Amino acid sequence: MKTAVVLAAFSALMALARAQSPLASMGGGGSPMGMGMGMGMNRMMLPMLMGGMDMKHFALMNMLGGGGGMGGSRMLPLMAALRGNENMLPILLAAKGGMSNPLAMMAMLGGNDNLMNMLPLMMSSGMGMGGGGGMMRGAGAAGGGAAGPGM
């Protein structure tokens, strides 16, 4: 029951965020399994930056089949800097094509820097969703991606 309430609140927050956010055009493809929640860059980053989502909820949504890649790779270094994780900037700048594992990225941007050493393993193990997209001027590219083999 608590999980359902959290997910409902998250959906409502995201509807508001999409309506207000200049990044609202950066969507994410939903997974065919589970709840199929699309998770583009703004839908993952906004609640985290606002303090409205922790890693347990994000992991739960991933297990339920929500997913999509992270578009807007040019924004990731900015997001890291805003969170005070400047030590992540070299890795973020090198990941020009988007991140193949949004769960790993969320953990690090959320302050769990000890996971940095696990990034290569997590990105190659199929634990996450496919990475995708970049950031185009104007509307912006969608962060795409299918579920990895680990799903």
UniProtKB/Swiss-Prot annotation:
Superkingdom, natural source: Eukaryota
**What is its subcellular localisation?**
Secreted
Keyword annotations for this protein? Secreted, Signal
Name the organs or tissues of expression: Component of the acid-insoluble and acid-soluble organic matrix of calcified layers of the shell (at protein level).
Signal sequence bounds: 1-19
Any Gene Ontology CC annotation: extracellular region
Q: List the protein's name.
A: Glycine and methionine-rich protein
Q: Which organism is it from?
A: Lottia gigantea
